[in-house]
């Protein structure tokens, strides 16, 4: 009998995300907010929405909804690009700067707890296997 690997991976992602959402709730953030803020923080300043969507690996319309929420919370600002009026540049606010370390601490602690009892060799192997699966899937997409 074949292993339901796809279902297992999907379930793992769902419960991991739910735990992150739960742990970030006191900060009034979600896993989606964290991924977005983390990427804005890691990328060079004044990224466009298009560049940010590519870095995260999502479509721009999906990103816009999250950016609207983060802007409403006062965590980002968006300005129209001088050279391309259709493009928006994204910046973290001072409020976000203060929150980033707290948010990253929650993520780091949670990741450590999730990976407890798993050796660094096992984690490296898992990362390699996931990369192979991703490569195979991308190859299949390119042939369809």
UniProtKB/Swiss-Prot annotation:
Q: Where in the cell is it found?
A: Cytoplasm
Q: Which GO terms describe its molecular function?
A: DNA binding; DNA-binding transcription factor activity
Q: Which Pfam families match?
A: MarR
What GO cellular-component annotations does this UniProt entry give? Answer: cytoplasm
Concerning what turns on (or off) its expression, the entry says: During infection of the host cells. Down-regulated by itself. Activated by Mg(2+) starvation in a phoP dependent manner.
Task: Report the PROSITE patterns cross-referenced here.
Answer: HTH_MARR_1, HTH_MARR_2
Which keywords, in A-to-Z order, does the entry hold?
Activator, Cytoplasm, DNA-binding, Repressor, Transcription, Transcription regulation, Virulence
Q: What happens when the gene is disrupted?
A: Decreases expression of genes encoding virulence proteins. Decreases virulence in mouse.
Specify the HTH marR-type domain's residue ranges: 2-135
Q: Which InterPro entries match?
A: HTH_MarR-typ (IPR000835), MarR/SlyA-like (IPR039422), Tscrpt_reg_MarR-type_CS (IPR023187), Tscrpt_reg_SlyA (IPR023071), WH-like_DNA-bd_sf (IPR036388), WH_DNA-bd_sf (IPR036390)
**Taxonomic superkingdom:** Bacteria
PANTHER family reported for this sequence: TRANSCRIPTIONAL REGULATOR SLYA, TRANSCRIPTIONAL REGULATOR, MARR FAMILY
Family that this chain belongs to: Belongs to the SlyA family.
Q: What is this protein called?
A: Transcriptional regulator SlyA
What is the phylogenetic placement of the source species in the record?
Bacteria, Pseudomonadati, Pseudomonadota, Gammaproteobacteria, Enterobacterales
């Amino acid at each position: 009998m074949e292993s339901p690997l796809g279902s297992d991976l999907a379930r793992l992602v769902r419960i991991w995300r739910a735990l992150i959402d739960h742990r970030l709730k006191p900060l009034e953030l979600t896993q989606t907010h964290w991924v977005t803020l983390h990427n804005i923080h890691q990328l060079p300043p004044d990224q466009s929405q298009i560049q940010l969507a590519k870095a995260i690996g999502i479509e721009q319309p999906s990103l816009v909804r999250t950016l609207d929420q983060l802007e409403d919370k006062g965590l980002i600002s968006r300005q129209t690009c001088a050279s391309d009026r259709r493009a928006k540049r994204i910046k973290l606010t001072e409020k976000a700067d203060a929150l980033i370390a707290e948010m990253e601490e929650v993520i780091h602690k949670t990741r450590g707890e999730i990976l407890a009892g798993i050796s660094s060799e096992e984690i490296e192997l898992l990362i390699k296997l996931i990369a192979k699966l991703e490569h195979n899937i991308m190859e299949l997409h390119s042939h369809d």
